Curated annotation (Swiss-Prot):
GO terms for molecular function: zinc ion binding. Forms a complex with DabB. This is Probable inorganic carbon transporter subunit DabA. Its cofactor is Zn(2+). Part of an energy-coupled inorganic carbon pump. InterPro entries: DabA.
Length: 812
């Protein structure tokens, strides 16, 4: 028997339903394709809520917990890593009405395992319980089978057409797919054929058929989108990209309509057996989202763990520095990406000579470019995903020789593509191995035994595709140098180091590249900036603006391989015989620093007993942990380098050079808070989500991965597209390598200036007010002096939670 459609459901307007669908679309994060994958905050849609409320919402929508098991916190409390004072301080931050009555009750709650999280059921799950048929699995498998073809980015030889949109394309296939009927869903293909022609009309129709109330829409739509896993997030990515370019995209709504057609068909097929359970589910979806007492306890424990880490960080920053200060002109200044992996190398390099100092800046070096590589028509967005490219660049000068080389490279590439398609074609693939297998023996042995060598990028030096006038070049150079707090005291040699990772047999390789460069390596941006700052006309104009670069200062680009800590200098871009001796010395320093950094990294990597083992891991097909990437990230520090130089931050901190005394109007501070800090928060929260909820926010087991459509990976034979980080990226097989802590942001600047920026940017402020990020102001000695407590208020940070009586809140 069919469920009787309620009067409320019938009265729901088209606009109300579509608005709820659009809100649900923004409750899930986007997923970038593998070729340019970047870290994404899985809690992007919950940034306006505190952790305990987000926990309640995601438990209903996904059946997950968003903090670690309580035993994890109990172990740290017992070992003394979390102190009683940390627990007390965290307890005080929780809303008084919802927290335990006292700290003793909180400590008792730690010993009790929290209830297993349960999502509100869908119709598919209710039907599974009644019929003993795995309808959720069948739905996921059929949608995944179609989506892999629809969203394919060149992997499939026979691509599914996309004309008409996702909903229309799916209907064409679903009306001829008898799998649901074979499984027991009678009449499904006919119901799809009879469904409304547009996704929006289908949503309205299904809402009525399912008897949904207005209050249930948001929660139910969110729930259905989470059941789609990465496929919903791929659609969300399309919406993100469209809105970035001033447009829109209906793909998320299309997928939601597809999923709801399955629900409506299952409810119709299930009859009266599903009605009681479904009515209860609708009531649960309609109930307001509210944090439980267990959610509050878990959020307090998470806060206590983060306060313990902040206390340790303050101790490191307050300790005397071992850095040696140069009394004369520096020999080498080397700018790195703020990436936490750079901290290890920077510390190693600076330890070699007092004439060396390093700087930290976002790895795209202020160049928001769309770059076309040599012999390619693909424009790569090499900038933070929050931004749109402002300049289009290409590789090589338009000379006859370069044009001939490009034509030859294109012919070679087309031949390789044709050969690759021949290997995979439906007929030729059967005879391919027998006919040509022997000629691959040498390559198989070389690659299988990790004997192949990585090579530095060989593209010609990049340049703007259309020449930029002097005023534009001058404005760009001045803006970038000021943003780097790098306007004086230039060394003879300044190296701008982008970073990338050279690994093999790794679908997530782009995730190891530079996040600020959109998932690409950073050498192109560094080369462009070096060329700009070596321009004599630009230097003359900068001098008129008060930025004097000595005539003997040479800027060079470099590429830091974060997997092996090898550094490639692009000295041929700007030949300078007068700097030959400097380059020889710098080359030696970089080699020595690389050896030191590899030795430190080897201590954390499994089966890396010596620093020499690191290079082999990068070439090993079977290596599932070539590097730890950004695992362990805990802090973001924007301050002069002197505040962190000579202090061992263990590769856990993003380091951004910033001097507020030179930042008139605090425009640079605003840029740091709204761009690099947000990107760092996405990275931190991706690692956090992949650790606390790997079943939902993690990519699963690398050993089971199959690349699908060039978009992402599935585990095994198909189904749900996995998102986030593989388990091997946060766990070494015995213990967690990433400690799931929300990022602590430390800024050396007046609290009034920071507060004014937060007030102008509500979305940024929400991250701090709801404690997705912690915020501290450093004093003039680089010590943590003030803690942001929300609502534009600050308290004195004393470094020891026991001194709560010294708390003094002020309004910034």
């Amino acid at each position: 028997m069919l469920m009787t459609t309620t009067t409320i459901a019938m009265s729901l307007s088209h606009d109300v339903i579509i608005a709820a669908a659009q809100r649900a679309a923004r409750a899930i994060p986007p997923l970038w394709p593998l070729a340019s994958s970047v870290a994404v905050n899985p809690f992007l849609g919950q940034a306006s809520e505190p952790l305990e409320v987000a926990a309640a919402r995601l438990r209903r929508a996904s059946g997950i917990a968003v903090t670690m098991p309580r035993s994890w916190y109990a172990e740290r409390l017992q070992s003394g890593e979390i102190t009683e004072d940390d627990l007390q301080a965290a307890f005080q931050t929780a809303p008084a009405a919802r927290r335990p009555p006292n700290v003793s009750a909180l400590k008792h709650a730690i010993k009790v395992a929290r209830p297993a999280p349960q999502a509100i059921p869908t119709v598919a799950e209710l039907a599974r319980d009644v019929t003993a048929i795995d309808w959720p699995g069948i739905v996921n498998e059929r949608i995944g089978h179609w989506a892999a073809g629809y969203f394919d980015q060149g992997q499939a030889l026979w691509a599914v057409g996309q004309s008409g949109g996702a909903y229309s394309t799916w209907r064409i296939i679903a009306t001829h797919d008898l799998t649901p009927e074979i499984a027991g869903l009678a009449g499904f293909s006919q119901s799809v054929s009879d469904a409304p022609a547009t996704a929006e009309d289908a949503l309205v129709d299904c809402v009525a058929r399912l008897g949904l109330s207005p209050d249930a829409l948001d929660g139910y739509f969110h729930r259905l989108l989470t059941t789609l896993g990465g496929w919903g997030q791929v659609a969300r990515y399309r919406l993100w990209q469209a809105e970035l370019n001033g447009g829109t995209d209906a793909c998320v709504t299309d997928l939601l309509a597809i999923r709801m057609l399955w629900e409506a068909a299952l409810l119709h097929n299930g009859g009266s057996a599903l009605v009681p359970g479904w009515q209860s589910a609708i009531a649960a979806y309609a109930a307001p989202v509210a944090a439980s007492s267990d959610d509050v306890v878990d959020s307090i424990l998470q806060e206590a763990a983060e306060r313990a880490a902040q206390r340790k960080l303050n101790t490191v920053l307050a300790a005397p520095s071992s850095a040696r200060l140069s009394r004369g002109r520096l020999t080498l200044q080397m700018a790195f990406c703020i990436d936490v992996r750079s901290e290890v190398f920077r510390r190693a390099l600076e330890s070699l000579d007092s004439g060396i100092t390093t700087l930290g800046f976002a790895g795209f070096f202020g160049f928001g470019i769309g770059h076309r590589r040599f012999a390619s028509d693909v424009v790569e967005a090499r900038l933070p995903v929050l931004l749109s490219p402002g300049v289009v660049t290409c590789a090589g000068e338009p000379t006859p020789a370069a044009n001939a080389a490009e034509l030859s490279a294109r012919i070679t590439a087309r031949a390789k593509r044709a050969w690759g398609r021949f290997k995979l074609a439906a007929i030729s693939s059967f005879a391919f191995v027998e006919a040509t297998g022997p000629i691959y023996i040498a390559k198989l042995l070389r690659d299988g035994l990790a004997l192949a060598r990585h090579h530095a990028p060989t593209d010609p030096a990049p340049r703007p595709a259309h020449e930029l006038d002097l005023d534009t070049r001058l404005t760009m150079a001045a803006r970038i140098l000021k943003a780097m707090s790098f306007t004086s005291n230039f060394a003879r040699l300044v190296v701008l180091a982008g970073h990338g990772a050279k690994v093999v047999n790794n679908p997530h390789a782009s995730a190891l590249h530079c996040g600020a460069c959109g998932g690409y390596s950073g050498e192109v941006n560094a080369q462009l900036l070096a060329s700009l700052l070596n321009d004599h006309q630009v230097r003359a104009g900068l001098a008129e603006r008060g930025i004097v670069i000595p005539a003997d200062t040479l800027f060079l680009a470099a590429l830091h391989d974060t997997t092996t800590d090898a550094v490639t200098l692009f000295a041929d871009d700007h030949p300078s015989p007068t700097h030959a001796q400097d380059l020889a010395q710098v080359t030696q320093w970089l080699a020595a620093a690389g050896a030191l950094a590899r030795g430190e990294r080897a201590l954390r990597l499994p089966r890396a007993n010596r620093s020499q083992d690191i290079a082999h891991r990068a070439r090993d097909w079977a290596e599932i942990r070539p590097e730890w990437a950004l695992a362990g990230c805990q802090a973001f520090i924007a301050a002069p380098r002197s505040r962190s130089a000579g202090r061992d931050l263990a590769g856990r901190a993003f380091l951004h050079d910033y001097d507020w005394r030179c930042d008139h109007g605090f425009g640079v501070l605003e840029l740091i808070l709204t761009a690099p800090v947000v990107v760092a928060s996405w990275i931190s929260l991706q690692y956090y989500g992949s650790t606390v909820a790997p079943e939902r926010f993690g990519a699963g087991n690398k050993l089971l991965h199959n690349v699908t459509g060039g978009i992402g990976v599935v585990e095994g034979n198909g189904g749900i597209l996995r998102t986030g980080l593989p388990w091997q990226s946060v766990h070494d097989g015995e213990r967690l390598i990433h400690e799931p802590l929300r990022l602590s942001v430390l800024i050396e600047a007046p609290t009034e200036a920071i507060g004014a920026i937060l007030e102008r940017h509500p979305q940024l402020r929400a991250l701090f007010d709801n404690r997705w990020l912690h915020l501290f102001a450093l004093d003039d000695e680089g010590r943590m002096a003030r803690r942001y407590i929300g609502d534009l208020s600050w308290e004195t940070y004393v470094g020891d939670a026991s001194s709560q009586s010294n708390r003094a809140s002020t309004l910034a």
